[in-house]
Amino acid sequence: LWNSAVYGSGYDREWLNRRLIQQGGSITAFEVQCLKKMLDWWENDPATDTQRLGVIGLSYGGMYALHFGALDTRIYATYSSCWFSDRKKHNWCDWTYFNAERTFFDTETASLVFPRRLYIEVADEDEAFPASDGRQERLRLEAYAAKTGNADKLTFKEFKGKHELDLDSDALETFVKDVKGE
């Protein structure tokens, strides 16, 4: 992702997102569509086991993993790290849009992954999205998963750490088992 504060001007993500919203889309929708097209291409590789596809992402990647897993049923397991939170507290332009509060927050997006497997982790000392900011969303998601018979498809973990993947091997081992359907 382009960060003009770091890399200089020449690409204005917010301006591009506003233009896409005016056309009925968003930068997130465009980039998730790019991921879907990448998967279309990858599926044609004979070495790809199309029954064992998973997506994993950290931070912005966690957002894309969650949206991609929600929108593409070819993804069997989704792992989103250090992104799930309360969008009222983290109201950034590329994932909050007009009337968002009446439609989709993180719980609603995550619920679209079901009945496939979903692994979400949050860090207790995350500088960007502290675990405490997303506790209400977590409760909503767990209640939804239980109500719809998908509690066994959800793993939600709060770990000791910062804005990083959980370094405990259980996280990746769980994801690999989920991808394998174990």
Model-based region annotation:
Residues 1-44, 87-94:
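Cap/lid segment of the alpha/beta-hydrolase catalytic domain
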Residues 2, 79, 119-121, 157:
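Hydrophobic/aromatic beta-strand patches that form the interior of the parallel beta-sheet core
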Residues 145-182:
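C-terminal catalytic histidine-bearing segment of alpha/beta-hydrolase fold enzymes
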Residues 34-37, 64, 108, 136, ...:
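Extracytoplasmic/secreted proteins, especially bacterial periplasmic and envelope-associated proteins
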Residues 36-109:
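Primarily recognizes the serine-hydrolase "nucleophile elbow" in alpha/beta-hydrolase
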Residues 7, 22-30, 56, 97-104, ...:
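Alpha-helix capping and helix-loop boundary segments enriched in small/acidic/polar residues
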Residues 2-4, 8-9, 62-64, 85-91, ...:
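Flexible loop/turn segments at secondary-structure boundaries
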Residues 77, 86-146:
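The feature captures the conserved acid-bearing segment of alpha/beta-hydrolase catalytic domains
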